[in-house]
């Protein structure tokens, strides 16, 4: 694959990540709106968030039965089209129950996209450039925060809460058209000798102790952040008195900072080592966790923005080396199944974090959120535990590429 085609592939995968991350991320800053529109509690809002991630976790487990049995491109397009349809159902929902069902459907189809994208990266990109590639794709998180979430919040404030989901649908349709051109045929894994049964493939994947440690590692890593993340906007509005317009500004500034930091962390992970970078970020993760949950009432907007930037640079930055570690911890023959199970572990970690965080916080008589700092304490404990588990994980530094690229690859530059 030429460098130009490789870059177009990374940008396409980043676009897919952007839309399905935006679909998930826009939920959390809209928390105050959903609690009012649907007349639900903070815990019920947490259930909306966790419903998506639980569904994504189940989807990841199911995907482990078929991810290595189809051409990566065809599977990616089918799942992405289904995700787009489910997001359209979210936009059309009118009640809490309808919206919950649509979120579950979006989780079932969207939950596999991240694992499949990481599998394609591991298939196509050599180990020595994998951290940089992960940084490009993972920067979609920052872009969704810089552009997608603020635009979504603006549309929700000026039109309705349905509008952000229509935005995701429109963008997804554009990405589908591009993906048809830029994603190559990847099917070398289909030609592996002595292919086992579906159940046998899963059993062979999970019977490797290194894989089990890796699944636990990634679950703990994402659970750290999701103890806190779903309730940030609710805390900002209820306790800090931040207006909707200022929340948009805070998200924009935070996303802009992580857009830069994601690329820097990806390059450093390749130069200094994925494990080394993850460890250093984890050692300081306590600072943003406690800072964002202990901000006092009356804090100036600039301080809130600084703390928010610190939080997402460090907390989300951990996911770049951790994703590269996971892609390299897989047995190459079982990479698709492994990454599906890895995605399931991440989704379940997010869901458990959102549910646990919702149980730790409550409201006082004045409607203020109390006990939010407990989510930070629990998150930091999980971060330390993930470091201990990481010591048990072995990575394959020279994982061979298993890519077969179609000779008639219709690269964008050929148009």
Task: Kindly give the residue locations of the regions a language model identified.
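Juxtamembrane intracellular "pre-TM" segments in multi-pass secondary transporters
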Residues: 1-3, 184-215, 411
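Extracytoplasmic gate region of multi-pass secondary transporters
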Residues: 27-28, 211-252
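Helix-breaking motifs and short loop linkers at transmembrane-helix boundaries and internal kinks
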Residues: 39, 71, 92-98, 241, ...
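Conserved MFS/SLC helix-loop-helix module at the cytosolic interface between two early adjacent transmembrane helices
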Residues: 58-97
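Cytoplasmic helix-loop-helix junction between adjacent transmembrane helices
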Residues: 102-143
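Helix-loop-helix hairpin linking two adjacent transmembrane segments in secondary transporters
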Residues: 136-183
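A membrane-interface helix-boundary motif in multi-pass transporters
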Residues: 157-169, 361-381
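C-terminal transmembrane helical hairpin of 12-TM major facilitator-type secondary transporters
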Residues: 275-322
């Amino acid at each position: 694959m030429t460098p130009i085609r490789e870059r177009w592939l990374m940008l396409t995968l980043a676009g897919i990540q952007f839309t399905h991350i935006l679909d998930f991320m826009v939920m959390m800053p809209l928390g105050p709106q959903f609690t009012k529109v649907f007349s639900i509690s903070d815990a019920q809002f947490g259930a909306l968030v966790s419903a998506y991630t639980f569904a994504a976790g189940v989807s990841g487990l199911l995907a482990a039965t078929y991810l290595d049995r189809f051409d990566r491109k065809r599977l990616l397009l089918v799942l992405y089209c289904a995700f787009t349809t489910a997001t359209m159902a979210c936009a059309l929902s009118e009640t809490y129950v309808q919206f919950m069902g649509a979120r579950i459907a979006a989780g079932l189809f969207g939950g596999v996209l991240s694992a499949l994208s990481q599998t394609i990266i591991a298939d196509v990109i050599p180990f020595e450039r994998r951290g940089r590639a992960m940084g490009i794709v993972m920067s979609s998180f920052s872009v969704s925060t810089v552009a997608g979430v603020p635009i979504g919040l603006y549309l929700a404030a000026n039109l309705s809460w349905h509008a952000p989901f229509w935005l995701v649908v429109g963008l997804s349709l554009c990405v589908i058209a591009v993906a048809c051109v830029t994603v190559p045929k990847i099917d070398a894994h289909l030609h592996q000798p002595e292919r086992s049964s579906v159940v046998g493939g899963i059993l062979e994947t999970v019977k490797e102790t290194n894989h089990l440690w890796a699944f636990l590692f990634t679950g703990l890593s994402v659970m750290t952040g999701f103890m806190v993340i779903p309730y940030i906007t609710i805390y900002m509005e209820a306790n800090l008195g931040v207006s909707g317009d200022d929340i948009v500004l805070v998200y924009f500034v935070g996303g802009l900072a992580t857009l830069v930091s994601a690329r820097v962390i990806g390059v450093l992970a390749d130069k200094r080592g994925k494990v080394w970078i993850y460890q250093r970020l984890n050692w300081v993760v306590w600072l943003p966790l406690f800072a964002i949950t202990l901000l006092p009432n009356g804090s100036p907007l600039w301080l809130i923005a600084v703390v928010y930037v610190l939080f997402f640079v460090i907390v989300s930055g951990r996911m770049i080396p951790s994703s590269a570690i996971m892609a390299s911890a897989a047995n190459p023959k079982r990479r698709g199944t492994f990454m599906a199970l890895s995605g399931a572990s991440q989704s379940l970690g997010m869901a458990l974090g959102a549910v646990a965080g919702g149980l730790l916080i409550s409201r006082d008589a004045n409607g203020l959120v109390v006990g939010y700092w407990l989510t930070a304490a629990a998150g930091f404990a999980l971060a330390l535990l993930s470091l201990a588990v990481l010591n048990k994980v072995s990575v394959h530094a020279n994982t061979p590429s298993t890519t077969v690229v179609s000779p008639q690859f219709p690269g964008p530059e050929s148009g």
